[in-house]
Amino acid sequence: LSGICHSIENDLIYRGGGPIFYKHFSYKLDVEKNGRVRDRSDIDQNMEGLAAYVLKASTMRPGDVLFVGSVSGRTASVVDLAYEAKKMGIKVIAMSSMTYAKAVDPVHSSGKKLYEMVDLTLDNCAPAAEAMMEVEGIEAPYAAASGIASDYILWSVTSVAIEELMKRGITPGILKSANFPGGNEYNKTVVEPNYEKYGW
């Protein structure tokens, strides 16, 4: 999972009821410096070329599945990640808003947006500019739509994936709540033998 939403990734990864086959994937370029503080947000989001090096240095392999999230689908680094992952034989699924993506221009040098680079796009149906609500006296809308929608979609996908694995005779590791009696002990029996050997 990369860039979906911190709260959603936390809702899926390492929590009670969550499968162990999901792992967080993130990266950034950090340069040691003694100069003045500079806002790097625009640089980090629109830097092309870094994804290829990051993927080669990662443990991802052909046949793995990478979920990539960007509501607008135009951020260059996200598009670059999807492009480079596909070149490696990784299946790429996007979580994006088609309404938003079609309302903005691409930033990536290919002239493409995220949904045009992936194997499958899950449309979270967020409006352009993301938010749903408006109030008189405030120019910006509020209440982002993508979080709730993406959470629902990803848990639906997860449920289908678990059912499909079971049909194939594969029992995926599902974590119990650490706050439930015996939860931690059970989780050790699931994570250590399953994930390290099989990835599920």
Name what the model sees in each region.
Residues 3-159:
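Glycine-rich phosphate-binding loops that contact phosphosugars or nucleotide phosphates
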Residues 17-18, 163-200:
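Active-site phosphate/pyrophosphate-binding segments
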